[in-house]
Amino acid sequence: MTTQYGFFIDSSRCAGCKTCELACKDYKDLTPEVSFRRIYEYAGGDWQEDNGVWHQNVFAYYLSISCNHCEDPACTKVCPSGAMHKREDGFVVVDEDVCIGCRYCHMACPYGAPQYNETKGHMTKCDGCYDRVAEGKKPICVESCPLRALDFGPIDELRKKHGDLAAVAPLPRAHFTKPNIVIKPNANSRPTGDTTGYLANPKEV
């Protein structure tokens, strides 16, 4: 492998505006039911009494998630046709001419990255905009973010600059597939496995 690319996700900046998601849908000409990049809204909190005075500790934060181009992708392991594969540059992509549309990859991926396109009759997914990267550009989602909450580059450089946190609630633990992402947590972020909050927009992700 030449270079493993990855995404930096700054949850402290993300306002959940979905500009990245819409820019991706436009650039990739996606159908309404398919979104390669999705915005997770995690929220929770309750009321607590302190000497007869009630206080609330309500919280919410956003995470912009697409395919994480994992080091150990679950999708490639279950693909019976070999359509789902990892390139030399680390991008996990699907060969749409080979895909048989069995959806095993979608069932295996803990992030729901591979998505079935009803119109095309096979699986589709984020490819990291490798065509843009080859031209020295960043993925369209990164370029479109108005709050600069996303960045992209060699994962080793991103980890050196931002640390190696790769999981907060509601994401799964990173050891399952070793996702190539780095997360800067929101002040309200909860650890993976947290039960004090819930996914507030399940139909959108």
Curated annotation (Swiss-Prot):
Listed CDD domains: DMSOR_beta_like (cd16371)
Region (Disordered): 184-205
InterPro entries, A to Z: 4Fe4S_Fe-S-bd (IPR017896), 4Fe4S_Fe_S_CS (IPR017900), DMSO_DmsB (IPR014297), ET_IronSulfur_Cluster-Binding (IPR050954)
Domain of life: Bacteria
Cofactor dependence: [4Fe-4S] cluster
GO molecular function list: 4 iron, 4 sulfur cluster binding; metal ion binding
Cofactor binding summary note: Binds 4 [4Fe-4S] clusters.
Binding-site residues, [4Fe-4S] cluster 4: 79, 99, 102, 105
PROSITE patterns, per database record: 4FE4S_FER_1 (PS00198), 4FE4S_FER_2 (PS51379)
Sequence positions that bind [4Fe-4S] cluster 2: 24, 126, 129, 141
Coiled coil: none
Signal sequence interval, chain numbering: none
Boundaries of every 4Fe-4S ferredoxin-type domain copy: 5-33, 59-89, 90-119
SUPFAM superfamilies to which the protein is assigned, alphabetical: 4Fe-4S ferredoxins
Composition bias type Polar residues, residue spans: 186-195
Residues at which [4Fe-4S] cluster 1 binds: 14, 17, 20, 145
Binding residues annotated for [4Fe-4S] cluster 3, in chain numbering: 67, 70, 75, 109
Keyword set includes Electron transport: yes
Keyword line: 4Fe-4S, Electron transport, Iron, Iron-sulfur, Metal-binding, Repeat, Transport
Subunit structure: Heterotrimeric enzyme composed of a catalytic heterodimer (DmsAB) and a membrane anchor protein (DmsC).
Stated role: Electron transfer subunit of the terminal reductase during anaerobic growth on various sulfoxide and N-oxide compounds.
Alphabetized PANTHER family for the sequence: ANAEROBIC DIMETHYL SULFOXIDE REDUCTASE CHAIN B-RELATED, PROTEIN NRFC
Identification of the protein by name: Anaerobic dimethyl sulfoxide reductase chain B
Organism: Shigella flexneri
Gene responsible for this protein: dmsB
